[in-house]
Amino acid sequence: MKRGATKEEIIRITRELIARNGIRAVRVDEIAQTLGISKRTLYEMFTDKNDLVSACLEAMSHQQRERIVACRKRRGGNPLQKVLRLTNEYIDNLYTVDHRFLSDISRKIIFEEHYDEHREFWRRELTDYLETCRQEQLLLPEIDAPAFAEQLMNTILDLRLNGTVREELRLFCRTILRGAGTRKGIELIDRKP
């Protein structure tokens, strides 16, 4: 048996397990066995499985925020290409976990707050980029950036849950953005970054 797994190690291993198998499929026994510790040790650090999963979700959110900040700091490209980079980052994020995990987190009430905060963060980022595109007349004037961002994110998630492959989702986003673009916007989307 391992001596004294750290809280960070427990969170890291649990994150890997729930990302690969979904929240419901992972049992506390499996987590303890994988770490080589007793369930009692786990329960000394986390009140229950939900507390442990919440800690994992917090760590995942933190990591995703860092990725978005890094994406935002990348220079180069026009505003629509930046929207494409952000949507690609969102898509890549959805593929870091199994579709069962996405389904579990969106349905379990106890994790609703984590799910909502995560979606709101992505939606806000995407809306900001889309607003910039509208202001620069790269998107059609009738595009409502918040509604467009929300609908695009919902559609991407639904397609991911239904087994659409990553490259198809990327092509879908590019096609949707081209359809929402002005002539100038379409030219910029088609330009190589």
What are these regions (language model features)?
Residues R85, R124, D128-E136, T155, ...:
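C-terminal peripheral helix-coil segments that are non-catalytic and often amphipathic
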Residues M1-N21, A25-T34, D51:
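Basic, helix-initiating cap at the start of DNA-binding domains
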Residues N93, I110-E136, P146, R160-L161:
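Amphipathic alpha-helical packing segments from all-alpha helical-bundle domains
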Residues L102-I110, D190-P193:
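Short linear capping/connector segments at secondary-structure termini
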Residues A55, V69-T96, A149:
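Hydrophobic alpha-helical connector segments
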Residues L80-Q81, E117-H118, Q135-E150, T164-E167:
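All-alpha amphipathic helical-bundle segments outside canonical DNA-binding/catalytic cores
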